[in-house]
């Protein structure tokens, strides 16, 4: 494979992958159906040299009722990165674990379970507290989590807080004469 487009053509012949989005010549993204993600990831690692899992992250598309997982892989020999995106329903946010393919994925999966509520059955230590010790509310990275309500219920007001509103502060910095 010499280009991302050639790699995409090969992947399309093997898996039902979506359109290729090229950010830069060395960085592209493709959407993969949930049920084909693991086999696509394994192929990319074993056959195409994408040996490094750079990151695993999520986006909460609240209005669409979806989570988007992005698995960013790197082929260090070729100096290229490929992101695989998979969409999950928010009300059934479960994805197969890939900790056996990339052991570091277990850490990312623990974080995503804790911060978004996405489940990765079989992932090691998945249900142990990771960052949010004693957390009882909905996962805080979900867009329906009310940060302001949580802050008001959890923290006391302190003097001077009302004078440090970021919008007011920036307005004073940018327009010191009140213009």
Predicted regions and their residues:
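Terminal low-complexity/charged segments
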Residues: 1-179
């Amino acid at each position: 494979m010499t280009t991302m487009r050639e790699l995409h053509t090969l992947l399309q012949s093997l898996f039902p992958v979506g359109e290729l989005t090229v950010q830069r010549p060395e960085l592209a993204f493709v959407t993969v159906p949930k049920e084909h993600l693991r086999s696509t990831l394994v192929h990319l690692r074993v056959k195409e040299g994408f040996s490094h899992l750079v990151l695993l992250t999520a986006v909460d598309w609240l209005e669409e009722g979806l989570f988007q997982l992005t698995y960013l892989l790197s082929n260090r020999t070729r100096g290229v990165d490929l992101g695989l995106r998979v969409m999950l329903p928010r009300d059934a946010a479960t994805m197969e674990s890939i900790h056996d393919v990339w052991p570091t994925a277990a850490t990312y999966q623990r974080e995503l379970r804790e911060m978004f509520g996405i489940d990765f059955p079989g992932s090691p230590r998945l249900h142990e507290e990771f960052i949010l010790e004693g957390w009882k509310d909905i996962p805080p990275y979900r867009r329906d989590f009310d940060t302001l309500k949580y802050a008001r219920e959890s923290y006391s007001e302190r003097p001077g807080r009302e004078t440090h509103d970021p919008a007011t502060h920036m307005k004073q910095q940018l327009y010191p004469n009140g213009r």
